[in-house]
Amino acid sequence: MDRERIAGLIRELLQQLGEDPTREGLVNTPKRVAEALDFLTSGYRGNAHEQIQKAIFVQETHNMVIARDIEMYSLCEHHMLPFFGRCHIGYIAKDEVVGVSKLARLVDLYARRLQLQERLTDQIAHALMDELHADGVGVVVEAQHLCMMMRGVEKQNSMMTTSAMLGGFRLSVATRTEFLTLIGRHRP
């Protein structure tokens, strides 16, 4: 990413908004925005294989592994406004498990892009399934979207929930129910 070019574009944007980019409070804003965008879109410069393969451990277990309440934030691709919330990941290990921190890194990898929550959920699930060859993967993302809170319908307390269920999580109601119960989202 060319930070200097992005800073120049932000400077021009400020002018188009009627601001003076040379005034005291805005002098460094273009540089700061460019740095922030570089970080907030850093997911484009990584890949799941590199993240996960660093920490795969042989473990003969066929149990469900769950990481709950992984904090995440992303930028909505429609308005480039943040959405933020929590991601819950479960998988049924076959012969390998992944280091728990790699699950959080996988969430960050896909969240740090211009995103749709639906796509984010699917990308996390498919990456984990592909890399671990798990018997099943379940991912639930719950998020609040500033594009819905600050503009448009202006609904302050709305929460969007998306899920992706693959393999055993999709095929077995019992497995899916166990996962949703353990993450605290199953309601009879």
Model features per residue range: what roles?
Residues 1-188:
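A domain-level signal for the structural core that forms small-molecule/cofactor-binding pockets
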